[in-house]
């Protein structure tokens, strides 16, 4: 099984209830597509290094998952691309222990 780290930034002007629902939805997408969620961290609101879509800050979320294939991360990326609430995301495959 491979371990992935998924980081995504939610736009800062989202309401708290909508942000909670969005985070649950996207973390749930990873779980329903066969990935095991190892940990999920909410880093809170942080300043961006540069503006993204005229936003100077955003809510950072980091999720570590373990999966046999990349189906879960592919589905996450597909839905994150079309979501207006996620302003940036990144999926990284962690190195396997040797």
Swiss-Prot record:
Alphabetized Pfam families for the sequence: Ribosomal_S6 (PF01250)
CDD domains for this protein: bS6
GO cellular component, one term: ribosome
Database matches in SUPFAM superfamilies: Ribosomal protein S6
Keywords: Ribonucleoprotein, Ribosomal protein, RNA-binding, rRNA-binding
RNA-binding among keywords: yes
Gene Ontology MF term list: small ribosomal subunit rRNA binding; structural constituent of ribosome
Superkingdom per UniProt: Bacteria
Keyword Ribosomal protein: yes
One Gene Ontology biological process: translation
Function: Binds together with bS18 to 16S ribosomal RNA.
Family: Belongs to the bacterial ribosomal protein bS6 family.
NCBIfam families for the chain: S6
Name of the protein in its database record: Small ribosomal subunit protein bS6
Native source species: Staphylococcus aureus (strain NCTC 8325 / PS 47)
Primary gene name: rpsF
